[in-house]
Amino acid sequence: MAPVIKQQDDLLLNLYIQPKASRDQIVGVHGEELKIAITAPPVDGKANAHLIKYLSKAFKVPKGDINILKGEQGRHKQVKVISPRVIPENISSQL
């Protein structure tokens, strides 16, 4: 499966999350997933909340337009971005 899939106006992202990183960044392709490093620890949903906030800024959409479809409790996640206004360059290259 591809790391980034376009579904009409939406994007489906297959992600591998690296929590407790030194900074927030989209690292690149990691196997068949897109690796994203975030600074938040994987405790009490903090990493998921931080990931949603980071992705909403990257795609310039409200936080409500970022949905974690699979992987709430793990590092491997499937996330849907509804009608992104901007697609970061390192993600658009995967389309």
UniProtKB/Swiss-Prot annotation:
One of its GO terms (cellular component) is cytoplasm. Disulfide bonds: none annotated. Belongs to the UPF0235 family. HAMAP family: UPF0235. PANTHER family: UPF0235 PROTEIN C15ORF40. This is UPF0235 protein Swoo_1329. It comes from Shewanella woodyi (strain ATCC 51908 / MS32).
